[in-house]
């Protein structure tokens, strides 16, 4: 998973991030390039990630941009639920880690383990490989909070979950 610092101050202000070629481009163009390359992306964010008045569309947009996970210090309650409903896994930093303390630049590769047997509020290991090859091992709290949310994620979101269950019943 390639780190895309969509939640960084620069990107919020300027709406630009690094694309797969390392060059600065719009968030949309970078997201499409990563999707075309088959590379899932991660957003790193701060405290109360997702707070605001258009939370449902924020989660939909995140999913449509090909983002598979959001790693933040904390989540706004409804937005966290909306991310899960869209099939995007929310994770929270643990042990005082955050995007600033880890000195993230957007050139990192992220690998999150333990997702094949996910359970509510499970702590999972995450390996952040910096551009220079340095590896930072951190733990994340998976903010899938309930058993039904695990099922939503396993199906790719609540809509896929409902449609598959309707198809089974038919």
Question: Model-derived features: where do they sit?
Answer:
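Glycine-rich oxoanion-binding loops at beta->alpha junctions
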Residues: 13-34
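Extended hydrophobic packing segments that form well-structured cores
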Residues: 141-148, 155-167
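Extracellular/luminal Protease-associated
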Residues: 32, 36-76
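Glycine-rich phosphate/pyrophosphate-binding loops
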Residues: 58, 65-97, 163-168
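Flexible loop/turn segments at secondary-structure boundaries
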Residues: 49-57, 77-81, 99-100, 135, ...
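Acidic, glycine-rich flexible loop/linker segments
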Residues: 80-152
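Single conserved hydrophobic/aromatic residue that forms the stacking wall/gate
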Residues: 1-7, 12
